[in-house]
Design a protein with these regions (language model features):
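Glycine-enriched alpha-helix->loop->beta-strand junction motifs that scaffold or abut catalytic
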Residues: 60-69
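Divalent-metal (Mg2+/Mn2+/Ca2+)-assisted nucleotide/phosphate chemistry catalytic cores
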Residues: 39-40, 60
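Short, acidic/turn-prone active-site loops that include or flank metal/cofactor-
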Residues: 73-77
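An alpha-helical appendage that flanks or caps ligand/catalytic pockets
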Residues: 1-39, 80-81, 88-181
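Short, acidic/polar
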Residues: 51-60, 126
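Hydrophobic faces of well-ordered beta-strands that scaffold small-molecule active sites
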Residues: 48-51, 68-70, 102-106
């Protein structure tokens, strides 16, 4: 839908499972008609990037988006979590789209003094945020970030972090985040 709007070729009409443009008669003001974007985009090809987590949304990302913003991305393990969904979506990808780009963020610390155990000082800054997502973003059994950590092979650690976090022990949950995670 966004790409059609940005093209500005004609007024937008779209009927999908969840979106209808313009609204059908009897909804909204009842004056709905296909409209064309008034503004002229600075560039014709505006990249669409999705931050998706679970199989169906990752599959749709690989099929439709220009780029993917995964969370907790581990280059040596990501295929065991998202590989099948990425392959399935890529197989349906339009040849008119460029290959899917992946941008996995992370923390960066540049300091020559951070060697050996001193590296943990940097990791300690990240641990509370990881604990929040793995332990506190969702109910027990319905936390997508916790699920990802389990799929990476950190079942015990993810359960412990969540147990601590949900029982109000946020600092302990942060300390339970292992260095490898």
């Amino acid at each position: 839908v966004c790409r059609e709007v940005w093209k500005r070729e004609k007024g937008l009409s779209y009927t999908g499972q969840t979106v209808q443009v313009p609204l059908p008669a009897g909804q909204g003001t009842g004056m709905g008609k296909p409209l064309k974007l008034i503004n002229h985009p600075v560039r014709a090809d505006i990249p669409v990037w999705w931050a998706s987590l679970k199989d169906l949304s990752v599959e749709a990302t690989a099929e439709l988006a220009d780029g993917w913003l995964p969370v907790f991305f581990m280059p040596d393990k990501f295929e065991q979590v998202w590989g099948a969904a990425l392959k399935k979506g890529s197989a349906k990808r339009s040849p008119s789209l460029k290959p899917l780009e992946i941008s996995a963020g992370g923390l960066l610390a540049i300091d020559e003094s951070l060697v050996g155990e001193a590296k943990d000082k940097v990791l300690d800054m990240a641990r509370p945020n990881v604990a929040l997502y793995v332990g506190g973003m969702g109910a027990r059994g319905k936390n997508f970030y916790n699920d990802i950590c389990r799929e990476y092979g950190y079942e015990h650690e993810a359960a412990e972090i969540q147990d601590l976090y949900l029982s109000g022990k946020k600092d302990e949950a942060a300390r339970a985040v292992p260095r490898e995670m």
